[in-house]
Amino acid sequence: MTFGLVLLTFNEIEGIKELWDQIPFDEFDECFAVDGGSVDGTLEFFQQMNFSVNGQSKKGRGEAFRIAFNKSKSDFLIFYSPDGNEDPKDIKLIKNHFSNDDSLDIVICSRMMKSAHNEEDEQIFKFRKWANNIFNLFANLFFNKNFYKGYITDSINGFRGFKRSSFNILKLDAEGFTIEYQSTIRAFKNNMKIKEIPTIEGQRIGGESYAKSIPTGLRFINCLFKEILF
């Protein structure tokens, strides 16, 4: 049983510098980054740290996932974005769940379950969280065969790990931020075993999110209808 850690980056120099020493690289058989074309010093930082980087000729988070599995030889891959939203302490927890139960197909860090925290929780109007919960409800209603006993609370969050053999079965073709939503839906369709763990979502370190609310929401709607129809 081998494990790989993948850092997904696109202009994350502030985040990667602040979080680097908290990432448990020593826990993994291989570690590398997939970078979407950073121009802010992220690539130079990786070079300074002698850290392997795979570039993308085709942009998109979905493409980054596929590149990672093509480049990796590990049985399990964990994806981490060093932007401040994702808690590096949870990386080892994801790995431990796979180590303790190799029947798991996907492990997801949930921002919505009990003991978890979403970055909008202190706000009065939680538009992003509410939208996520709606998309999540639809995914469970339409596709989750174990809806009542195995309701998945955060089908969208990108902080997750996959078993290689399971990822290959999913045959994911989403290009951008819908890759995780599509992977959860297709895992439901294939009756895969998904484990969620509560996570504390932090505030972004530097810059702005590349997942703009309205365009991203429209892509999620498109993804949902495609999975319903096909």
What residue ranges belong to the model's regions?
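Cell-envelope/extracellular polymer assembly enzymes that use nucleotide-activated donors
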Residues: 2-4, 182
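Short, well-formed alpha-helical segments that are part of the catalytic scaffolds
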Residues: 11-25
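Short beta-strand/loop segment that forms part of the nucleotide-sugar
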Residues: 20, 28-37
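Conserved donor nucleotide-binding strand/loop of the catalytic core
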Residues: 29-32, 43-71
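A conserved acidic beta->alpha catalytic loop
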Residues: 35-43, 84
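Acceptor/aglycone-binding surface of glycosyltransferases and processive sugar-polymer synthases
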Residues: 56-59, 63-71, 76, 89-177, ...
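Catalytic donor-sugar/metal-binding loop of nucleotide-sugar-dependent glycosyltransferases
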Residues: 172-175, 184-202
